[in-house]
UniProtKB/Swiss-Prot annotation:
This is Bifunctional purine biosynthesis protein PurH. SMART domains: AICARFT_IMPCHas (SM00798), MGS (SM00851). One of its GO terms (biological process) is 'de novo' IMP biosynthetic process. One of its GO terms (molecular function) is phosphoribosylaminoimidazolecarboxamide formyltransferase activity. Its EC number is 2.1.2.3, 3.5.4.10. Pathway: Purine metabolism; IMP biosynthesis via de novo pathway; 5-formamido-1-(5-phospho-D-ribosyl)imidazole-4-carboxamide from 5-amino-1-(5-phospho-D-ribosyl)imidazole-4-carboxamide (10-formyl THF route): step 1/1; Purine metabolism; IMP biosynthesis via de novo pathway; IMP from 5-formamido-1-(5-phospho-D-ribosyl)imidazole-4-carboxamide: step 1/1. SUPFAM superfamilies: Cytidine deaminase-like, Methylglyoxal synthase-like. GO terms for cellular component: cytosol. Belongs to the PurH family. PROSITE patterns: MGS. It comes from the Bacteria. PANTHER family: BIFUNCTIONAL PURINE BIOSYNTHESIS PROTEIN ATIC, BIFUNCTIONAL PURINE BIOSYNTHESIS PROTEIN PURH. It comes from Enterococcus faecalis (strain ATCC 700802 / V583).
Amino acid sequence: MTKRALISVSDKTGVTTFAAGLVANGFEIISTGGTRTVLEEAGVPTLAIDDITGFPEMLDGRVKTLHPNIHGGLLAKRGNQAHQKALTEQGIHFIDLVVVNLYPFKETILKPAISEAEAIEMIDIGGPSMLRSAAKNYQDVTAVVDPSDYEQVLSEISSTGTSQLATRKRLAAKVFRHTAAYDALIADYLTTQVGETEPEKQTLTYERKQTLRYGENSHQQATFYQSVVPVSLSIASARQLHGKELSYNNIRDADAALRIASEFTEPTVVAVKHMNPCGIGTGKTILAAYRQAFEADPVSIFGGIVVLNRPVDQATAAEMHQIFLEIIIAPSFEEEALALLSQKKNLRLLTLDFHAQEKKAVELVSVMGGLLIQEQDTVVENDQAWQVVTERQPTPAERDALNFAWKAVKHVKSNAIVLANESQTVGIGAGQMNRIGSVKIAVDQAQAAGKLQGAVLASDAFFPMADSVEYAAQHGIQAIIQPGGSIKDQASIDLANHYGIAMIFTGTRHFKH
């Protein structure tokens, strides 16, 4: 009996060559609409779908392959006599291979000003149904959803007359992943349309971007997946211009640096090590900002990740070229700057769009047996609503420094303390189990660098005791910003008043675990 393949694709890549190869191996081709036109124009003979179903397309093409003559031919087991008898009685032929990719729903909803009605018309019904039928019957039927699989399938058919069972099983798994992701995207779109934020069942869709050499450590396997709906301001969307492939740790550190850089509109440079900033600097030019970030901690920046929110010019590149860095990310690189930095073969240089405005994003954290989902901490705070709780008001310069430090401290691992001036972090205490411990680390760092005088202090959460204020006062800190909210707030306020310290309560905590 002549073998049959049903081909109906929105992505026409390689389809004419593949179909011609099938015909050369004795297959009849059944096809629909635009795919059939493309194949016929390429000289590939086809049968129209309504020649098989005996029923015309209807409802503006919504119904064309949903028919027993199609799904019976896909689902019938070849070794089952009852199935064969049923097909014979109904005049249905086996269909041995299905090549389908789905309506471009994702591409449609990413277009600007797309109406809901337009999006709904791009929800494919017949395609997923055929793919699922073929994939369920992978013992006998080959289901192909990706043009990258054409070559292997055709090679096996040319060699043995059929695809290998292992290949069919692999492709079946690929089909179910594909249709599940497709349905998840539709569900997410409709969920967003109705404003639901906590659906009872959560489905997440990502595409493999890169197989990594290893994970956090060399004995751990790792893969980098990208959201099917791209996020422009993300390491996943960055374009790499030079250097080795990114590692697992590179990606996490770069993500942390990008999140910090996105807080600032003025020229800003962020240096990150192990998910924490080691230096943040702003300036009138990107060179001035880089110098501020470098001088914040010239030791820790070595081997770090640097993000600049302005194009890299030759002068800035020349200074970065003097030290060892893992990654530099910027909106762009001037030609001379790129040439200079590219002399370091292992230095990774990436660009991305810093002007992209994304909808509110969520972040995911896996726990044993579960998944935590929360909104990203991107709350926009109104500093005019902050409350000065002490007798002394901060000076304008202190206010600027407090604002800068507050933007920085939310990106430091809790318990987090940042000492800063108006344009530079000068001491960072991160990840300590008690807050006074982080205060001491930040003060020691600033003191060692000779930058403690005039620095202000930011704390990501309230002071549970007044000891942090006491220690800060003993080391000359004259302005503090914190969320407030402790049952012992008054003790901290009284101590600040005693030392003439200005203190602001923001009312917003920024824990980072």
